[in-house]
A protein has these predicted regions:
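Transmembrane beta-strands of outer-membrane beta-barrel pores
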Residues: 90-98, 121-123, 130, 145-151, ...
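Short loop/turn motifs that connect adjacent beta-strands in outer-membrane beta-barrel proteins
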Residues: 60-61, 65-84, 97, 130-139, ...
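Transmembrane beta-barrel domains of outer membrane proteins
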Residues: 75, 125-129, 190-193, 239-241, ...
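Outer-membrane beta-barrel pore domains
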Residues: 108-111, 151-154, 166-170, 174-178, ...
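Surface-exposed coil loops of outer-membrane beta-barrel proteins
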Residues: 97-114, 152-189, 193-276, 286-293, ...
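N-terminal periplasmic/intermembrane-space "pro-region" immediately following the signal or transit peptide
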Residues: 2-102, 108
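Glycine- and aromatic-enriched membrane insertion/assembly motifs of diderm outer-membrane
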Residues: 83, 109-149
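Hydrophobic, lipid-facing positions within transmembrane beta-strands of outer-membrane proteins
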Residues: 120-124, 183-190, 197, 234-238, ...
C-alpha cells in the first residue's frame, strides 16, 4: 500500500500541535536565537540540564539520579571577568538508502557526509559580558572560533571565490570541490550595556528562528530545513536590545544582510529587529524580522556582469510553552520572500513543531515535525516542492560536561510541478530515512 506521506505528516502535526506544550527558554550567553533550546542550563555556556523542577514534584516521574555537579572548565575564573571555554562534538550520520559518499545525506543540513564519522565542531570562545547592573555602564566582547565538518557551512557567504574574512578557510576539499572540513569565526563583536539597553557591534548569531549553529544549544543532531535554507546564521552590523518594559524584549538594528562579514562586497543593507513577550510565566512569543536590500553579485567581467539580488523580507515567529511535568512544546513559523529579481520572486515558508519530555536529569526525549515549502526551487535543491520531515531523538547527559544525541529522521519530498523531483540519495529518491548520533564534550 502506498503511504500518503503528506497526509500522514499533517495529521501528526495536528495531533502534536493540539496538545499545547514547551518552555519559555532563555538563550543564555550564546548571543543566538532568544528562544534556543538548551540554554535553560544553570550555566548558560553549557547545555547540561533542562529546567525539570516540575517533573520531580507531583508528576510522579523518575527521580534525579545523575548527581550532576558544576561543569568542569579548562580555564577557571579570573579577576578580569573573562570566560574562556568551548566544546568538541563528533558523530556519525547515515542513511538507509545505502549511499555512502561525501554528500550522501544531502540535502539534510550540516549532516551531508555519510561515508565516515565526522568531527563536527571543535569550538573555542572567549567572552566578557557587559555588566550594567554592577557598573551602570560597561563594555564587553565575544569571539568564537570553529573548526570541523560544520566549518564550511558556517563561513561568511557572499564572496564567490574571493578569500574574505573566513570564506573558503577549508582544510579538506575533494577534487570535485566538495568542502568537507574548514574553519570559521562566526562571532566577533563588542557590547555596550547601560540601564535597560544592550548594544552589540560586530558579527553575531542571528536572533531569528529557533535552532542555531552551536551544537550544545540544539536538542537534535540534524537541523530543520528552515534553519539551514530559510534563515540567516549570522549578521554583521549593529543590534540594540531594550528590556525596559515588563515581560518584554525589543531588538532593532542594521546589518549587512545574511551571513556576510565585515567586507560587505555585495552591498547588502537590511533592518534586523523583533519583539519577545512573556504571555505567562510558562509561555513566550517571539517575532523577528529581517528586511531590506539583498545586494548584488558580479558573475562575470564587464558592465553586464553584475546581477541584482533584489530585496529580502523574512520573518520568524516562535511560541514556546512549558506544560509542566517535564513536558515542553515549541511552534515555529517562517516566511521569506526575495523580490525584484530577474525571473520572478522567490518564496519560502514552513512550520516546525517540537515536543520534548525530560525524564530526569540524565535523559530527555524529543520529536520534531517539520514542513518546509520551497515554492520556486530557489532554496534547497533546485526543485520546487514541499519537504516533510519527522525526527525522533534523545539526549543522554551522564554528567555536566557530556551530551549524547541519538536520532532517527524520516524525510519526504513532494514536488509542486509534477516533475517528479528526487532530492535525496544524490538525486535518486524522493524520500529517505536517516540515523545517527553525536557526543558533545564541553569545557
Amino acid at each position: 500500500m502506498k503511504m500518503d506521506w503528506k497526509a500522514a505528516m499533517l495529521a501528526a502535526a495536528m495531533m502534536v500541535g493540539g496538545s499545547t506544550v514547551a518552555s519559555a527558554q532563555d538563550a543564555g550567553n550564546y548571543s543566538a536565537s532568544p528562544v534556543s533550546y538548551s540554554a535553560i542550563a544553570s550555566d548558560g555556556e553549557y547545555a547540561t540540564d533542562l529546567a525539570y523542577t516540575d517533573a520531580y514534584g507531583s508528576c510522579g516521574t523518575c527521580a534525579d539520579y545523575c548527581g550532576h555537579g558544576v561543569p568542569w572548565t579548562l580555564f577557571g575564573e579570573n579577576c578580569y571577568g573573562m570566560k574562556i571555554g568551548g566544546w568538541i562534538s563528533a558523530g556519525y550520520y547515515g542513511n538507509f538508502r545505502g549511499v555512502d559518499t561525501n554528500n550522501g545525506n544531502g540535502p539534510v543540513a550540516f549532516r551531508n557526509i555519510s561515508n565516515a564519522p565526522t568531527v563536527d565542531q571543535a569550538w573555542l570562545f572567549v567572552e566578557r559580558e557587559a555588566d550594567a547592573e554592577t557598573y551602570c555602564f560597561d563594555l564587553g566582547y565575544r569571539a568564537d572560533f570553529l573548526w570541523g565538518a560544520d566549518g564550511p557551512d558556517t563561513q561568511a557567504f557572499g564572496y564567490g571565490n574571493r578569500h574574505r574574512w573566513d570564506n573558503r578557510w577549508d582544510s579538506a576539499v575533494t577534487d570535485a570541490g566538495e568542502e568537507l572540513y574548514g574553519s570559521a569565526i562566526p562571532q566577533l563583536y563588542m557590547t555596550a550595556a547601560w540601564g535597560d539597553w544592550n548594544v552589540k557591534l560586530g558579527r553575531f548569531f542571528t536572533i531569528m528562528g529557533y535552532e542555531t549553529v552551536p551544537a550544545p544549544q540544539n536538542f537534535f543532531y540534524s537541523h530543520a530545513y528552515t534553519m539551514n535554507y530559510g534563515e540567516p546564521f549570522t549578521h554583521t552590523g549593529a543590534l540594540a536590545e531594550y528590556n525596559g518594559f515588563d515581560r518584554t524584549t525589543i531588538w532593532g538594528g542594521y546589518t549587512n544582510g545574511w551571513d556576510t562579514a565585515f567586507d560587505n562586497w555585495e552591498g547588502q543593507g537590511t533592518f534586523l529587529g523583533g519583539i519577545s513577550y512573556d504571555l505567562t510565566d510558562r509561555t513566550t512569543a517571539t517575532w523577528t524580522v529581517n528586511a531590506g536590500d539583498w545586494g548584488r553579485i558580479r558573475v562575470a567581467d564587464g558592465p553586464g556582469g553584475v546581477v541584482d539580488k533584489g530585496d529580502i523580507y523574512m520573518n520568524s515567529f516562535v511560541l514556546t510553552h512549558d506544560i509542566g511535568c517535564g513536558w515542553s512544546y515549541v511552534f515555529q513559523h517562517d516566511l521569506g520572500v526575495q523580490s525584484d529579481i530577474a525571473g520572478g520572486d522567490n518564496h519560502w515558508y514552513g512550520i516546525n513543531q517540537y515536543l520534548f519530555k525530560e525524564i530526569n536529569a540524565c535523559w530527555s526525549v524529543g520529536t520534531r515535525l517539520e514542513w518546509f515549502a520551497d515554492e520556486d526551487g530557489a532554496r534547497v535543491a533546485g526543485v520546487a516542492g514541499n519537504y516533510y520531515a519527522a525526527s525522533f531523538g534523545a539526549n543522554w547527559k551522564p554528567n555536566s560536561n557530556v551530551i549524547v544525541r541519538p536520532e532517527v529522521r524520516f524525510d519526504k519530498f513532494d514536488d509542486r510541478d509534477g516533475s517528479g523531483g528526487t532530492p535525496f540519495a544524490e538525486g535518486e529518491h524522493d524520500d529517505c530515512v536517516f540515523y545517527g548520533f553525536d557526543a558533545i564534550f564541553t569545557f
